[in-house]
Every structure is written in structure tokens, then in C-alpha cells.
């Protein structure tokens, strides 16, 4: 709950125009909030040292950038959910003491969970999506730490984390093309209709 509150409050403030700095990740401030703050919130509930915390945040940035490299900078898929969410769950799993297999399981869990979350532009409502991503990051990590992972027989999950992320990129580039056009059409129609009121 604290991860969700911290992350969504920061996004709400940022999208509301608060004049406060935010560290970006993969070129996005909201990605930065999602990649860092859930890990920061979790640290208060576990034993850890500063170096492990910093490595967890570093891992989150690396995974965020790696997923983003596959999904693309502009996509119909919400990068905060899938890219930064994957980074956050990897960082949380690492911080809590998870091994490589558990980090991979957590990434698969969150990508299966949030793969279909769309991006419909940067706005105040992003706080809700970041809330969801932060909660899902914690949940995916906890599931994996307890041996509960989505199998490669399910949906877009591949036989490796790399393949799962490649599948996510394929979904983003090839599967969501029409969704992207439809989202843009709806947003443009809203702008046109706003002037007619």
C-alpha cells in the first residue's frame, strides 16, 4: 500500500504541475517515479544496506531501459506499467534477497499482468496507472519470491525473460498499431469537440 500511495501521489503532483524535481528513467519522469519509488517504499519494511538499495534501483533503471528499447519510445502500451513496472519488480525482488530466477519470474508476472495497459497521453490520470503499476510490482515480486510464476505456456510469456520482453515489443509495435491510431483519433476528436461547446 505504501508503494502505491507514494508512487501515485508523486505522479499526481507531477502531472498537476508541482515544481519539484523528478529523476527520469528511459527519458520519462513518470517512468522514473515508477522505477524508483516502489523500491524506496519497500525499503522501510525490510533489512537492507545502502549499497543493496542503490543496486536495486540501478537494476530497475536497466530493466526499464531494456524493456523500453523493445516497446519503443512512443507506444500504445503504457511504459510506466510495462517497462518501469518490470524494472520496479526486478528491483524489489533483488532488494528483498531474490535470486536471478526469482527476478526473472517477477518480470514475467508483471508483464503478463499489465501487458494490455494502454498509453493515452501524459495527464493527471497517469497517477492511477502508476498506482496500479506500483502495486503490481510488489505483488509480482512477492509471488515470485514464493515460487508463484506465470509459465511459458501462458499468453505472451516466452521461454526466457528476453523472449518475453521481445514478445512485449512485438505486441507494442505490431499488435497495438490500430489501438494507437484509435487512441489518437479519440483524443483529437475530444479536442475538436471542446472548441464547439
What do the predicted segments below correspond to?
Residues 1, 17-25, 43:
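Glycine-rich, flexible beta-strand/loop modules in the N-terminal catalytic cores of phosphate-handling
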Residues 1-17, 50-69, 108-116:
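Acidic-glycine-rich active-site phosphate/pyrophosphate-binding loop
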Residues 1-2, 92-197:
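Functionally critical mobile loop/hinge segments
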Residues 19-37, 79-83:
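Conserved phosphate/anionic-ligand binding catalytic regions in large, soluble enzymes, centered on
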Residues 26, 30, 51, 72-80, ...:
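Alpha-helix capping and helix-loop boundary segments enriched in small/acidic/polar residues
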Residues 31, 77-90, 112-115, 132-135:
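Active-site-proximal catalytic alpha-helix in oxidoreductases
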Residues 32-48, 89-97:
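Alpha-helical support elements that line or immediately flank enzyme active sites
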Residues 50-68, 72-73, 79-96, 100-103:
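Helix-loop-helix junctions within the multi-pass membrane cores of secondary transporters/permeases
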